[in-house]
């Protein structure tokens, strides 16, 4: 350094300029902040003084960041040396001086705001304040290679990612699963073909948060899930069950009662009052005995039921004249009711007899009186070949003949003395208190029952007796049904023999004496028995006239009640003959045996088919009932 005269002006330091209020280069300037008091009041505490200073600094930094006055010296020589430049993919520098200065001011303001919030919880940061982007992160390794059978990723993510979202929400952290196996096979990676971040690392969970406390909390929950998946079996893992339940709820297949009740095969059947109701007839459940429609299957019939059915069957066969009357019927069935005194029955359609149950229970009418008119059944009295004749066996029906001739070609309606009497001459079944029929009996009830609604003592009955004519049978009268066919199996051996076998085994009885008619008054169905048996061999009077004479000769016989529905025939009117029948023979000459009766009246006028009442025999007197054969003509005179 030169001294003295050799000294230059540069060697002497420059004098400092005097400071003045108008100088613009002063380093210290007064700071004026709007809204902040410039005078500090006395008596403040240390916390209040610190809060005032911190708030003043926050406002100053906010003003600088807002106005862009970052305090960078304009002279480059006064600036501090810059670090190495950092460029982005576009070639722009990232760490410029302005960027570094702004980042420094933001960090300083962030620290001041954090301190101010701790001093004054009611402090509100500036509007342009944003927390810094720096975050705390941590990694949690997932032992997938050690336990390949456990799905750790599924336990962490959960159904639709809800488990991971819940952890992030609770811990205020961000969790990402990265590494090998974090991405499912087949998913497309980055478009540029580069690897995803952390893909070359082992499988792990990256936890990122603003604070270290949030990161630690999230890491602890992740480790608990991994530990539970390793130590607890899958069927006992509560987290796994909860995830499956939530997945079912999201899919709409959740049943809320699965865990509260047992399975159908494990729970007992609920008791119902209907299931406990048992029928006493059929043994079924669900209904009572009064509503049961079936009998108990397989129950054997009692002895009383069998005896009652046998008795009803024997009674029916006795009414048909095919079996003896059981001895107990008269005492158990109450007062006997004759068919003539029974109640009227409405007309039934053709070929439709009543059911056997009605015949067996009522026992009021024989079946040939209850059956309707039928053209398919022949009449015994209208053709030859009856029982015992040339027609066949004792129970075979002969073929109908076109003319009203006997079985041997004799006179019309002449009885064969060698064979059994015609059906209208056969005796009726004996009364219920007189035992069975005599052997060889084959016929139906006597003609007194065929009178139907005509009483014995009525005028119509006497009219027919006086004129030598048989009264017409009532409506609904039909001959007895034929016996069973030969192909029908016989009844079981335990029951009684069939009626036709009983009749074949019994020998013919001797004819009853004629004196029995005079000793006591016979019953109505016994009046024809004596007359028909005694007159069978004489041949002086025709059989149908013998019955009428015998009925007229017994005035003491009780009169039978007629059917109230039948209209009696007026005197002097003869029933019309059926179509196809031969005309009646002329009356016998005087002095013959047939002149004891009045000659028959002329036939009535023809019927009007258009009048239904006339056709039914209810409007014109003297017309026979519907579907009944007419009375036979009187016999020719005998020389």
Curated annotation (Swiss-Prot):
Changing residue 244 to A: Decreases RNA-binding. The modification Phosphotyrosine is found at residue 87. Residues 382-394 have a biased composition (Gly residues). Detected in lung, ovary, adrenal gland, colon, kidney, muscle, pancreas, thyroid, placenta, brain, liver and heart. Changing residue 20 to T: Decreases interaction with U2AF2. Necessary for the ATP-dependent first step of spliceosome assembly. Binds to the intron branch point sequence (BPS) 5'-UACUAAC-3' of the pre-mRNA. May act as transcription repressor. This is Splicing factor 1. The lineage of its organism: Eukaryota, Metazoa, Chordata, Craniata, Vertebrata.
